[in-house]
UniProtKB/Swiss-Prot annotation:
UniProt keyword annotation of Nuclease present: no
Cellular location(s): Host membrane
Biased composition (Basic and acidic residues): 288-297
Region described as Disordered: 275-297
Ranges of biased composition (kind: Polar residues): 275-287
Transmembrane regions listed in the UniProt entry: 191-211
Top-level taxonomic group: Viruses
Keyword Signal: no
Record gene name: S9
Name of this protein: Uncharacterized protein VP9
Gene Ontology CC: one annotated term: host cell membrane
Primary localisation category: host cell
Length: 297
């Protein structure tokens, strides 16, 4: 599994893990928001990954205010050598660790942290998750767009559970106060985003189930052909009907607007989250095999 870093700080970094496609299928790229890996690993552990050296050197983590906040949790997860993720179990926050069934060999995730400690961790992560949606997700899309036509087709399997939920419950951005619980439930059903730019289109389908989000970003020629020329971003309104949003700027590199998470209109509240992407991206990568660090989501 190859490993690439896209980003320059805790809030805009995405870790891209690439798996070789089976039986002629395109390689699968798994983007994971980087803030969980960066915040829940001590600096020495992070330095065991060559790909992270430049990022760690530039961050000065030891004095970073957000990094300091998570000292207790770094101690708690210090013995974790496999992937962890955040999840909601029966509506309650939980931290899960990847495990292997000794009888069948199948991989599953078991709860390793629940209750108040998990809830406190989620509250600490909420504002960081919102910042990732605002600056990290647009940067990732910009990176993916730059790869189209220069590399073989990849299938981007993007699991950002439960960042959307974290972001929409972040004080003072509590969407329950703005649109009510019915609006929250509608938001958790289905959202489709189409990003169009010139002759290239990136299709991102966010299928929102329960309190989590799973999405697939496809950049194959077939997907491009199917959606080229579409000038819209689509989302569902609070009645479940698809509605178009005219792309505000055909130059993708200059401006990217995402209807995440501000899907619904509210009095005196902006509907759009607007993020400007820089022309230069800080990207580093290598091809070390397997993943040993605590990985996000």
């Amino acid at each position: 599994m190859s490993f690439t870093v896209v980003g320059s700080n805790i809030y805009d970094t995405t870790l891209l893990m690439t798996r070789k496609g089976q039986n002629g299928a395109p390689d699968e790229v798994i983007p994971r928001p980087g803030f969980l890996t960066l915040l829940l690993n001590d600096i020495d552990s992070l330095r065991t990954r060559v790909e992270l050296h430049n990022l760690i050197d530039n961050l000065n983590l030891a004095t970073n205010e957000d990094y300091v906040k998570f000292a207790e949790y770094r101690t708690l997860f210090s013995q974790t050598t496999d992937m962890i993720r955040l999840a909601y179990t029966n509506g309650q926050p939980a931290v899960q660790t990847r495990a292997t069934d000794s009888r069948t060999g199948s991989v599953f995730y078991a709860n390793t942290l629940t209750g108040d400690k998990a809830g406190n961790l989620f509250r600490l992560l909420a504002p960081i998750a919102y910042r990732y949606l605002d600056v990290g997700l647009p940067r990732l899309f910009s990176y993916i767009h730059a790869q189209i036509g220069t590399t073989p087709a990849f299938r981007y399997n993007f699991d950002i559970q439960p960042i959307i939920k974290l972001a929409i419950t972040n004080e003072p951005l509590d969407y329950g106060e703005w649109i009510g619980q019915e609006g929250i439930h509608e938001l958790e059903r289905n959202v489709m985003i189409i990003l169009s730019c010139s002759n290239i289109t990136i299709l991102a389908v966010l299928s929102i189930v329960g309190l989590g989000v799973g999405s697939h970003i496809m950049t194959s020629a077939a997907d491009q052909e199917a959606w080229v020329g579409s000038p819209f971003m689509l989302s569902t309104d609070n009645f479940g009907n698809a509605r178009p949003f005219t792309a505000p700027n055909p130059s993708y590199a200059q401006t990217l607007r995402l209807p995440i998470p501000r899907i619904f209109s509210a009095p005196n509240r902006p509907v759009w989250v607007q993020s400007k992407t820089s022309e230069t991206q800080s990207v580093s990568g290598s091809t070390h095999s397997d993943e040993k660090l605590t990985a996000p989501m």
